UniProtKB/Swiss-Prot annotation:
It is found in: Nucleus membrane; Cytoplasm. This is Nuclear envelope phosphatase-regulatory subunit 1. Pfam families: Tmemb_18A (PF09771). GO terms for molecular function: protein phosphatase regulator activity. May form with the serine/threonine protein phosphatase ctdnep1 an active complex dephosphorylating and activating lipins. Lipins are phosphatidate phosphatases that catalyze the conversion of phosphatidic acid to diacylglycerol and control the metabolism of fatty acids at different levels. May indirectly modulate the lipid composition of nuclear and/or endoplasmic reticulum membranes and be required for proper nuclear membrane morphology and/or dynamics. May also indirectly regulate the production of lipid droplets and triacylglycerol. The chain crosses the membrane at residues 33-53, 65-85. The keyword Cytoplasm applies. Belongs to the CNEP1R1 family.
Length: 125
């Protein structure tokens, strides 16, 4: 393979990688917003649950029954983590990290947007 073909292959790979990472960004943003909203709801519900004087007087399950906002938001947050939201909010970073691992063997790397970074060849003495 000559240098021109190699350069074209690298450009095509870079275009495809940046396209893939950029396609993940809107979904990642939505998952981050969902996680933020549910986390704030859970924190607000937890605060109301903790400052309620009845919480100390009744059983744990009765206390949860008396605070449905906290209970539902907490169950939703746990469900989101079981569904893998913690992976979805960092999906572009995971893809970039895996690409960096593979590209390191070829003295290359990439940034978080998928742009290739060519490293200088090591000089063998």
């Amino acid at each position: 393979m000559n240098s021109l073909e190699q350069a074209e292959d690298l450009k095509a790979f870079e275009r495809r990688l940046t396209e893939y990472v950029s396609c993940l960004q809107p979904a990642t943003g939505r998952w981050r917003m969902i996680l933020i909203v549910v986390s704030v709801c859970t924190a607000t519900g937890a605060w109301n649950w903790l400052i309620d004087p009845e919480t100390q007087k009744v059983s744990f399950f009765t206390s949860l029954w008396n605070h449905p906002f906290f209970t539902i938001s907490c169950i939703t947050l746990i469900g989101l983590f079981f569904a893998g939201i913690h992976k979805r909010v960092v999906a572009p970073s995971i893809i970039a990290a895996r690409c960096r691992t593979v590209l390191a063997e070829y003295n290359m790397s990439c940034d978080d947007t998928g742009k290739l970074i060519l490293k200088p060849r090591p000089h063998v003495q």
